[in-house]
């Protein structure tokens, strides 16, 4: 915040580091700083923001310092959507991703939003996953049963479910619909 404010107040030179890595603490992360200057103040630094995620992964790999999956701008799970209400929102906004997200994923080299399945998932989350497997005619009670199992297994696992786990649940609930 101090670095962004310094530029807003006229500073022409600032020091930042990729992912904020460096000696001690308090280094301004380049990605967050550049993106804030661009989106909040309209200041184009000339830095290619589409490389941010790639560079952050490279720096994490070379430095051995792992970055949190939920790290702002470059986190691997930044565009994962687990919450059922947000999954519904993402489904309904189409290409207008600036409604549920502060910036488009391609601006920082991220992939498009991905609906994931976990304890916070909702009916639309399950319906989206079913649709991805060609099941578009599931009844509400079937989706509810699948959702209950998704939530239970996610809580037991303490994490998100993968495609194999989801299909296992679907086979149990609606066995005649999955190969």
Where are these regions (language model features)?
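Glycine-rich phosphate-binding active-site loops on the catalytic face of alpha/beta enzymes
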Residues: 9-26
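Catalytic cores of alpha/beta
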Residues: 1-11
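A mid-to-C-terminal "edge-of-domain" accessory segment
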Residues: 42-179
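Conserved, mostly hydrophobic/aromatic
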Residues: 10, 33, 130
């Amino acid at each position: 915040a101090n670095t962004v404010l310094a530029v807003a107040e006229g500073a022409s030179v600032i020091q930042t580091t990729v992912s904020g890595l460096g000696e001690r603490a308090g280094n301004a992360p380049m990605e967050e700083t550049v993106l804030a200057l661009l989106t909040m103040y309209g200041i184009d630094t000339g830095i290619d923001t589409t490389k941010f995620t790639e560079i952050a992964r490279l720096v994490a790999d070379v430095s051995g310092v792992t970055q949190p999956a939920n790290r702002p701008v470059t986190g691997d799970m930044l565009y994962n959507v687990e919450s059922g209400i947000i999954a519904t929102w993402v489904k309904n906004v189409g290409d207008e991703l600036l409604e549920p997200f502060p910036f488009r994923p391609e601006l920082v080299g991220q992939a498009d939003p991905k609906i994931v399945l976990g304890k916070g998932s909702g009916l639309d989350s399950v319906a989206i996953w079913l649709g991805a497997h060609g099941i578009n005619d599931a009844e509400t009670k079937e989706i509810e049963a699948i959702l209950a199992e998704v939530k239970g297994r996610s809580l037991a696992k303490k994490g998100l479910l993968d495609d194999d786990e989801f299909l296992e649940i679907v086979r149990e609930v609606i066995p005649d619909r999955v190969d």
